[in-house]
Amino acid sequence: MTTIVSVRRNNKVVIAGDGQVSLGNTVMKGNARKVRRLYNNKVLAGFAGGTADAFTLFEKFESKLQMHQGHLTKAAVELAKDWRSDRALRKLEALLAVADETASLIITGNGDVVQPENDLIAIGSGGNFAQAAATALLENTDLDAREIAEKSLNIAGDICVFTNHHHTIEELESTVELPKPE
């Protein structure tokens, strides 16, 4: 597996992921790129799960973004519908974390599209560790989104054997003023 974390703070959103690819208990690759920019660099996406499955889903998601002129939520819902109902897609095992300048979403193979509380996403084998770390950093520090994502991935990498310290980090700055969380 892997760890993907997405943090939104002060008009910036970051999706970061480690680079480890495992086959059973063996590390096959340490520098995989599991975070990408899509749709003219306006959407960030990261995956946890099977690599080949995730690349298939990236392609499908990007085509949905094109179809819906970059509208993240519509594209995510359409992908989730296809993923749940298409016999071939249904067998794909991966989770997607996606974000644009206004929304952060988790897309699952069960047909779920979830906008998490506080726009914090952490998925994959080290996701619980990264989420706990990122939550603590969001609530108790003034670190920016990138620093929180990096630190939470490092903590997950120290604990989870399926997460390493080779990170890919992508960041978007929002021009849209978002309401402050209460």
Curated annotation (Swiss-Prot):
Keywords: Allosteric enzyme, Cytoplasm, Hydrolase, Metal-binding, Protease, Sodium, Threonine protease. GO terms for biological process: proteolysis involved in protein catabolic process. Transmembrane segments: none annotated. It catalyses: ATP-dependent cleavage of peptide bonds with broad specificity. It comes from the Bacteria. Its EC number is 3.4.25.2. It is found in: Cytoplasm. One of its GO terms (molecular function) is threonine-type endopeptidase activity. Na(+) binds at residues 157, 160, 163. Allosterically activated by HslU binding. The active site is at 2. SUPFAM superfamilies: N-terminal nucleophile aminohydrolases (Ntn hydrolases). Its main location: cytoplasm. GO terms for cellular component: HslUV protease complex; proteasome core complex. The keyword Transport does not apply. Protease subunit of a proteasome-like degradation complex believed to be a general protein degrading machinery. Belongs to the peptidase T1B family. HslV subfamily. A double ring-shaped homohexamer of HslV is capped on each side by a ring-shaped HslU homohexamer. The assembly of the HslU/HslV complex is dependent on binding of ATP. This is ATP-dependent protease subunit HslV. It comes from Vibrio atlanticus (strain LGP32). The gene is hslV.
